Amino acid sequence: MKRYVFMLSDGTGITAETLGNSLITQFENIQFEKITIPYIDSTHRAESVVLRINQCFSEQGTKPLVFMTLVDPEIRQAIKKAHACVFDLFSIFIGPLENELEEKSSYTVGRTHGVANVKSYSHRIEAIDFALSHDDGIKTRGYDKADIILIGVSRCGKTPSCLYMALQYGILAANYPFTEEDLVGFRLPEVLRPYKQKLFGLTIDAQRLQQIRSERRPNSKYASAEQCRLEVTEVEAMYQRENIPYINSTKYSIEEISTKVLAIAGLQRKI
């Protein structure tokens, strides 16, 4: 069975996508065709979206699902005229909040992902810049400013996790990959010892590591099953020997890796 799913927003669409995806992933036997439409900022644009939704209804014979985070009441009402099952994620929560807080909402578009808070936005940019300039062990001199330093073998998820922590949490995250030289005896590199309290390890199943590396450098020693097993075994032994906290990233998304790392490390959101 296939169902169309529309994620509608007057902003970036990130919130509608996040909430919508969280709900539909609970239905494993249904194939969802997802369509995100951001920046619906007028009733005219809303009406064109309704035409598109209705077209899907006519073609499929089943109502599309619509998850929307639209602030303007007129635009919301326009969307609700569609032949669809509409989930108004804004009005579901804003009414009860107004009652509890005894204050009316400002109904301002773009509060979540906009630049309303200049200080928060500036810190996010600083964190992203830090993650990029301290990626892959490129620059270790700034490690004293890092909130956390991810370590691990090559291709276990360090770089995307650091960027996600920077973008979503404003965390200053660096990462250091273990090289061929580090593999000899697999001792903690001296450059990392002064920052041991900031270190957090990632590991990965050897079979999965081989798959990832083979896509990058097929038929190489780097991607061989033996090399991957050796590196994973040695790095996990080193984590345990050095008392460095670590998680296995094999079955987790980047979002899950990042939140687990922050929770275990006891780091709080900065933005």
Swiss-Prot record:
Q: Which residues bind ADP?
A: 152-159
Which top-level group of life is the source organism from?
Bacteria
Name of the top EC class for this enzyme: transferase
* Listed Pfam families: Kinase-PPPase
- Asked if the Swiss-Prot or TrEMBL record annotates the protein with the keyword Nucleotide-binding, the reply is yes
Keywords for this entry? Kinase, Nucleotide-binding, Serine/threonine-protein kinase, Transferase
Would you tell me the protein name for this molecule? Putative phosphoenolpyruvate synthase regulatory protein
Origin organism is Legionella pneumophila subsp. pneumophila (strain Philadelphia 1 / ATCC 33152 / DSM 7513)
